[in-house]
């Protein structure tokens, strides 16, 4: 099959499956009918049925990635609109994100250490709460497995976006700052998309949480590895 035709088919497959997954969730509101999850499972099913490799899918998937990279600029709008509230709460934002990052590191590092996993596995899993573009680079530079890091980043994001609303209700989080930072810190872009569905203010704080988590983690993960290895 011509590469351009295959790329177009993969793009159409992704867009169509996501569209119907979104419509399904709108008709049957349920956190487990997450459009990203349903569309991903649908894509995997189609690839397996027709024997299409990951590289074959990425002939079209890479174009979608380029478009998504450009759309990140859209996150600047909620940040700009809520800039005054962000400036008024800088210390709270930084302290909250730093605490979340450290708790994540402790959970992953101590658990894997206790079970005797190697440095490579620990490095692969530590960036799981960082947005993919940064997390992959951190894992690669420290000797982790890129493909597994991507898998854990996606899984973390999906779990956060699916269970986040239930956990926020359970914790009785009312503040848009708390909701947004929780989503951005724990489940990066997936969580930010979910926060934006709630309201633009939560989306703004989720964006800043996601950005700070990526920056802090990319600095602290190498330090942690140097200290213990």
Curated annotation (Swiss-Prot):
PANTHER family, A to Z: HOLIN-LIKE PROTEIN CIDB, PUTATIVE SEROTONIN TRANSPORTER
The keyword Secreted appears for this protein: no
Originating species: Staphylococcus aureus (strain NCTC 8325 / PS 47)
Protein name stated in the entry: Holin-like protein CidB
InterPro entries reported for this sequence: CidB/LrgB (IPR007300)
UniProt superkingdom: Bacteria
Task of the protein: Increases the activity of extracellular murein hydrolases possibly by mediating their export via hole formation. Inhibited by the antiholin-like proteins LrgAB. In an unstressed cell, the LrgAB products probably inhibit the function of the CidAB proteins. When a cell is stressed by the addition of antibiotics or by other factors in the environment, the CidAB proteins possibly oligomerize within the bacterial cell membrane, creating lesions that disrupt the proton motive force, which in turn results in loss of cell viability.
Residue intervals passing through the bilayer: 4-21, 30-52, 62-79, 90-112, 149-171, 204-226
Homology family: Belongs to the CidB/LrgB family. CidB subfamily.
Keyword vocabulary terms for this entry: Cell membrane, Cytolysis, Membrane, Transmembrane, Transmembrane helix
Pfam families: LrgB
């Amino acid at each position: 099959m011509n590469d351009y035709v295959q790329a177009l088919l993969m793009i159409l497959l992704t867009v169509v499956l996501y569209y119907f997954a979104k419509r399904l969730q709108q008709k049957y509101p349920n956190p487990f009918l997450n459009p990203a999850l349903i569309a991903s499972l649908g894509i995997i099913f189609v690839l397996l049925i027709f024997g299409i490799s990951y590289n074959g899918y990425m002939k079209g998937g890479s174009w979608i990635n380029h478009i998504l990279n450009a759309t990140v600029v859209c996150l600047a709008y909620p940040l700009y609109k809520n800039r005054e509230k962000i400036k008024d709460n800088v210390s709270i934002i930084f302290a909250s994100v730093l605490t979340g990052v450290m708790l994540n590191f402790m959970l992953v590092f101590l658990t894997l250490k206790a079970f005797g996993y190697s440095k490579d596995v620990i490095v692969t899993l530590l960036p799981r709460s960082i947005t993919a573009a940064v997390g992959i680079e951190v894992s690669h530079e420290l000797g982790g497995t890129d493909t597994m890091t991507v898998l854990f980043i996606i899984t973390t994001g999906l779990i956060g976006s699916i269970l986040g609303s239930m956990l926020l209700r359970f914790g009785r989080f009312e503040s848009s700052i708390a909701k947004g930072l929780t989503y951005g810190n724990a489940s990066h872009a997936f969580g930010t998309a979910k926060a934006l569905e709630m309201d633009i203010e939560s989306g703004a704080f989720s964006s800043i949480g996601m950005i700070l988590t990526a920056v802090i983690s990319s600095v602290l993960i190498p330090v942690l590895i140097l200290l213990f290895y």
